[in-house]
Structure formats: structure tokens, C-alpha cells
Amino acid sequence: MKMINKLIVPVTASALLLGACGASATDSKENTLISSKAGDVTVADTMKKIGKDQIANASFTEMLNKILADKYKNKVNDKKIDEQIEKMQKQYGGKDKFKKALQQQGLTADKYKENLRTAAYHKELLSDKIKISDSEIKEDSKKASHILIKVKSKKSDKEGLDDKEAKQKAEEIQKEVSKDPSKFGEIAKKESMDTGSAKKDGELGYVLKGQTDKDFEKALFKLKDGEVSDVVKSSFGYHIIKADKPTDFNSEKQSLKEKLVDQKVQKNPKLLTDAYKDLLKEYDVDFKDRDIKSVVEDKILNPEKLKQGGAQGGQSGMSQ
């Protein structure tokens, strides 16, 4: 999810918090972490240095992950997670290169796998709370291919054509495609300036409403399966769009559903915070530290704060 960000505070902060819960950090030597002739370093000192917000974030994340693991451990398949990792390894050019990429992010292979598992738990939670029907998925998604002729944003750009030339070229291609739509892929491979999709005969896969340029989306969702559009102008240039037949809908349905759930959470973070609150109630969560409780309630479980910050403490520590 876009709203997921890395946790920069070590999880050991949670251990410090637990040591401070239910007691004053100055009324017991048990709360002294380090002693010296110059004075002691207590849990309270360390918490003050790190900051309550970060400790609340870390401890809430740790608690939430424990709850999610308990609730959804039987629904998450480790074999599928291993398959995800193998896929990533191939994308990075092998195990060693993937391992180096993880190290650059401060991750180990085990930690990465743990993050994937936690992400899967969150998906299960949101799937429980946000219901999306097959008809809604079909209404909000469209399988598409396109041919793009880029327009230069400035004369010095190496890629693309000036607006007039780009439009003229797109119109010529559209006429060619209209004569024989079965050659769309062949023409896309040869003419499209979107090199990523051109390699795949112009295929974009499934496009969701709200995911792309508004003019592109408007034109695409007007098309019937198999139809080809007129020339469409977008912020990227000129397109010829084809609505592909969704023959693989059933196999792609779950992935599309997860993306739509993600969109809903982006638009309305209250869906996520309400799901978290339900979990806290279900598992009788009791915050022993009033300050930590205040931070969690005011910031982590506050949908308005999530909108402003674009990140949730409860789903931190995940990198995919």
C-alpha cells in the first residue's frame, strides 16, 4: 500500500516501553538501564530521548502484528509467500543480487519474509472489513492495451514529437489499426513509445478507475470489449486504446479486489482505523501507559491524521 512506510525506530523501543508500564521509572532500580559514577540512565530518560510518538508507533505495530498473526495465521499460506520471494529474486537477477538489494534497505531475507507475512495478515483484515463484489470489480476495472505517441514537454526532450507531429502520427496509426484490429499488438510493438507495454504488444493489463489519466480512463471505459478508440489526448501524449477481452478475469479477480480495497482505504482511512479499533476491542487491548494510549488514539487511530501524514503506524516496518 502507498500508505505503508518504513518504521525507523528499533523494535527494542517496545521492550523499553514494557519496562516502564505500570510504574514510575524513578521509583525502582529495576528501571535503570545503565549505571555509572556520573549518574544512571533510566527507562524514562531513554523514552524521553527517543520520543513518545516513536515508541507508541513501535509498540502499537508490535502489538497489532501479534494480534493479526493470532487471528489470521491459518489463512496465510507460507508457500505463496515463498513464491512471492522467488518471483522477486528473478526480477532482481538472482538470489545474491536480491540479497544485496535487501541489505541496502537494512533488511535480511527472514525480515523480508516476515514483512510479506504481515502484509498478508493486513490484506486478510481488510478483506474481512471491506466487501467488494465481482460486479463492482468488473465495473471499476478494464483490461486494456494502447499505443502511445509521446509529446515533448520541451523542445530539448530527446523522447517524443512536438504536439502537431505526434497527433498526426497517432491519427495515421489509428487508421492503420482500424483497417485490421487483429494487428494491434504487432503495430504497438513497432510504433508505441511506451517501451514497457510495447514489448508486450501494448498490453497494460487491468486498469482501475482513478488509477490513470482522466481522459485516458474516460475513453477506455466507454469502449466495449475488443473495440479500439479514436486518438485520445492525455498528459502523456496521444493514445490509441484497445479494450481487451477479460478472459483471465477469474485468475486476476483477487488481485484486483485487493487493489480496489487499497483505493478505498486511500480515499477513506477511517475504514482502516475502524478495523484496528475492532481488533483492539476483540482482543481486550489495555494500554498501561496513558501517554502511549493518547498518542495511539490521537495519531495512529485518527483517520484525519493518516490523511495528512500519508502513513499508518499500524502497518509500518513493511517494505516490498
From Swiss-Prot:
List residues of the PpiC domain: 139-245
Which GO terms of the molecular function aspect are on file? peptidyl-prolyl cis-trans isomerase activity
Reply yes or no: does the keyword Ribonucleoprotein apply.
no
Q: Which GO terms describe its cellular component?
A: plasma membrane
Indicate the secretion signal residues: 1-20
What this protein catalyses is:
[protein]-peptidylproline (omega=180) = [protein]-peptidylproline (omega=0)
* Protein's cellular compartments: Cell membrane
The UniProt entry, under Gene3D superfamilies, shows:
3.10.50.40, Porin chaperone SurA, peptide-binding domain
Q: Region Disordered: what ranges?
A: 159-198
Enzyme Commission numbers on file: 5.2.1.8
Lipid attachment (S-diacylglycerol cysteine) is at 21
HAMAP family, alphabetically?
A: Foldase_PrsA
Quote the function comment for this protein.
Plays a major role in protein secretion by helping the post-translocational extracellular folding of several secreted proteins.
* Family indicated by similarity: Belongs to the PrsA family.
Q: This chain belongs to which protein, by name?
A: Foldase protein PrsA
Organism lineage string:
Bacteria, Bacillati, Bacillota, Bacilli, Bacillales
